């Protein structure tokens, strides 16, 4: 094992990376409220794991979506638990994100030189809400259907570009299979990818600049 470690150490400098991670200075004013961002990340990882598990059984079609969700809840071993954890973690992620934003704002964590960290955080907040909007529709029950119809109909009030924007969101003039497919793609591929990218940027900037000082 020693030779294997030495081989990787020579090429990757693992010890230097470990020393950097474990030797970061933590200001004395830091308290439990500074953990809200980390809790949000943990919730996101839980979402990825449970969501990935459900993709093995979920069918993104208007005729089979609801039945596949019922199958997960009733027939799949611990399917009810996986979906319940996914829902609970989603609510927790939104709550922790909101509290994290308030903490950063109230402690002045958005000020120079951390403006870009704040910008990436705001983008992550928008992505988090987008997860909720797209995920809510996937069971394709009455609540999900009408929620999608209302949400996608909101941009219609925008002059000139309103109607084309609605058609872009729905995939057609009315809510249907194209809408569900788009929301499923957003929820399971595009939004997780964007969230991972901006989270990486967010944490790298925090590592570089450190935690903001007290007011």
Curated annotation (Swiss-Prot):
Q: Which PROSITE patterns match?
A: CYTB_NTER
Q: Which residues cross the membrane?
A: 32-52, 90-110, 116-136, 186-206
**What is its subcellular localisation?**
Plastid, Chloroplast thylakoid membrane
Q: Where does heme c bind?
A: 35
> Looking at the UniProt record for this protein, which Gene Ontology cellular component terms does it annotate, in alphabetical order?
chloroplast thylakoid membrane
Which co-factors does it depend on?
heme b; heme c
Q: Please name the GO terms of the biological process aspect recorded for this protein, alphabetically.
A: photosynthesis; respiratory electron transport chain
Task: Describe the task this protein carries out.
Answer: Component of the cytochrome b6-f complex, which mediates electron transfer between photosystem II (PSII) and photosystem I (PSI), cyclic electron flow around PSI, and state transitions.
Miscellaneous section: Heme 1 (or BH or b566) is high-potential and absorbs at about 566 nm, and heme 2 (or BL or b562) is low-potential and absorbs at about 562 nm.
**How would you summarize the oligomeric state and partners of this protein?**
The 4 large subunits of the cytochrome b6-f complex are cytochrome b6, subunit IV (17 kDa polypeptide, PetD), cytochrome f and the Rieske protein, while the 4 small subunits are PetG, PetL, PetM and PetN. The complex functions as a dimer.
Stated family: Belongs to the cytochrome b family. PetB subfamily.
Q: What is this protein called?
A: Cytochrome b6
Provide the species name. Welwitschia mirabilis (Tree tumbo)
């Amino acid at each position: 094992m020693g030779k294997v470690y030495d081989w990787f150490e020579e090429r990757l400098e693992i010890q230097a990376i470990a020393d950097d991670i474990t030797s970061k200075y933590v200001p004395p004013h830091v308290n439990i409220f500074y953990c809200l961002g980390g809790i949000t990340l943990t919730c996101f990882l839980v979402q990825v794991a449970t969501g990935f598990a459900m993709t093995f059984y979920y069918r993104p079609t208007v005729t089979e979506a609801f039945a596949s969700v019922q199958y997960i809840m009733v027939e799949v071993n611990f399917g009810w638990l996986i979906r319940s954890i996914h829902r609970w973690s989603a609510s927790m992620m939104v709550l922790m994100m909101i509290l994290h934003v308030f903490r950063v704002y109230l402690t002045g964590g958005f000020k120079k030189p951390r403006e870009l960290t704040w910008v990436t955080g705001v983008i992550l907040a928008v992505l988090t809400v987008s997860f909720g909007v797209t995920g809510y529709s996937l069971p394709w029950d009455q609540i999900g259907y009408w929620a999608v119809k209302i949400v996608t109909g909101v941009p219609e009030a925008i002059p000139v570009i309103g109607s084309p924007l609605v058609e872009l969101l729905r995939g057609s003039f009315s809510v249907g299979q194209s809408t569900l497919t788009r929301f499923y793609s957003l929820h399971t591929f595009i939004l997780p990818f964007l969230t991972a990218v901006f989270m990486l940027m967010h944490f790298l900037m925090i590592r570089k600049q450190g935690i903001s000082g007290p007011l």
